[in-house]
Amino acid sequence: MVQQFKVPETESELRQLQDKLYSITKEQTETGAFRGFRGLLEIMASETVIMTAIHNIKANKGAETAGTDGRTMRADILQQDYTQIVAKVQRSFQNYRPLSVRRKWIPKPGKSEKRPLGIPAIMDRIIQECVRIVLEPIMEAQFFKHSYGFRTWRDAHMALERVKDQVSRVGYYWIVEGDISKFFDNVNHTILIKKLWHMGVRDQRVLMIIKAMLKAGIMGEISENPLGTPQGGIISPLLANVYLHSMDEWITREWENKKTRTTYSSSRNQYQSLHRYSNLKPAYLVRYADDWILLTNSRENANRWKSRIANYLKVNLKLELSMEKTLVTNIKRKPIHFLGFTYKVTREGTAMRGYKPVVKPQADRLNRKMEEVLKDISLLQRSMDKAESVDKINRINAKIRGLINYYSVANHVNLEMARYGLRVQQVALHALRRKGGTLVSANNVSNLLSLHENYKTMLAAIPIGEGQYIGVTSPAFCKYQKTYCKKPEETPYTVKGRAIHWERTRKKMTLPRMEEILTSSTLGMLIAYGKTKPIYNLEYFLNRMYALNRDKMRCRICGKPIVDGDDYHAHHIRKNLPLSEINRVSNLASTHRSCHKLVHGQKSKDGFSPKAVRQAEKYRKKLLS
């Protein structure tokens, strides 16, 4: 029987629903009884999902990038009336017609050609995110456990670690480095819609909405897109994994997940038996989006797999495997290139199976990235004043630390990055000379203190006060970081999966909004209080709940718990901020209604503790600052 669910009224209910979608899909898929889900559109178009989608999008750095209609998240969504925006999104779901996307061309790393990035209109981004929120747990429950690209709590480091781990376990050294020609441009819409249906999306209305998303035209080029999924669309990464899921299943069904009549005590015993008594060709797949590698035991089998996969892609997915770029490599002799790293094995007697892994940053890619950083550093000389210089230095440091974090899993990463240290120092010193730039020991600068305090390397820095300096960090400040294999059970959609994530990262998921969802009765109450001014916009109603989370449901004035939604007021700490800043979570303080009146001098101090009175006076002063 096809499943249907109650529409969530709070973000807590939404998360419970996501868990349920995941668990039902997982259990029924494993037993072969999966029938899919209907009634998904009502969930996607619910007030709760819409608000969660808006919150997710506004947290991304590209939220303010306009689409073809010129509208942005802050001006045209967050600063508008709450009920009007929710109603507008819901109307869009009923008769969905996406606007054409704005195409932007960005350089391909190491190539003269550029790749297209499609930027949807902001309303289309919200619709896409609503769809993604509901579909992701259904798809995640079915995806291949060693697919790592565009998936929550998975990354490139885990994909690389899986390759290293599997090589050491099975002792195979032949690798097929897969290259699918122009994958995102050649996704067949009909095939993709059929795959969504077979993976449980049995709501025809949702399938039609996704089809409309895929066919959205490109401004100034075509009115309807016949092929491909636009790179830059929020839902595109999920759809890409859906499209390649059947390839994952087909390859793993041939070896890794081969069903046998005999039940074995371990997978190792099963594989040994398959070796002895079958003609199957060993294959271990690791995929990161459209980048994939396949590990096998001989050149002959590697070439057979290459040919078979090329045929499968052509016949079943209408895709082309680039035979020239899809390489067959023996990693004992030559490194492979995967996700910006090179990887091979070298002989060492004490290592497992006599070979140790050697991982390095891919030299040409790292060099390009560092050249971009050096260009940014040289542009520091154009800064108008010190404040602008400090802002740019912080951005440059973030880029350098980002590169270090990405390549920290490589052997001897400190030596690889140290090669750029002197050049960064010299270029930065030259660029900052007019701003009083000088060389300062790293442990004496005032930025990135927890990092710089461990080094005495001289950094190019500018003075910002008495004995205080802001410096351009060094790429040499890095250490090797051990990565561990991904536990497939780690997922945001189960209690066990979230516990594993906490154990690995010590990071908890963001708490759900503490709603009282803003129903018509709640909005009526707020209107009765006169909260219809421009500052009481969608952003206010959204962030007041996240402020309550941050304050752990306690009043910032009296310190007592806020247990009744009707008694909760979100106080604007500084009232004279512009509309773009006044409703940020940092400017909202959770209070009881009576405590809020005390802050504004509308209530007598009688009955309040001395501490509460002092807090109220403190916040009253901030109102005028």
PLM regions and their residue ranges:
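Non-catalytic, polymerase-adjacent accessory regions of viral genome-replication enzymes
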Residues: 1-82
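Duplex nucleic acid-engaging cores and interfaces of nucleic-acid transaction enzymes
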Residues: 2, 117-132, 140-143, 147, ...
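Active-site and adjacent loop segments of nucleotide-processing enzymes
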Residues: 2-20, 24-31, 299, 337-546, ...
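Reverse-transcriptase-like RNA-dependent polymerase core
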Residues: 54-57, 88-112, 122, 126-134, ...
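Short hydrophobic/aromatic beta-strand micro-patches
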Residues: 76, 120, 295-297
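Conserved polymerase palm-domain catalytic core
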Residues: 85, 100, 145-146, 151-154, ...
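Histidine-centered nuclease catalytic patch
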Residues: 179, 559-590, 603-604
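Short cysteine-rich loop/turn motifs with clustered Cys
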Residues: 539-568, 592-594
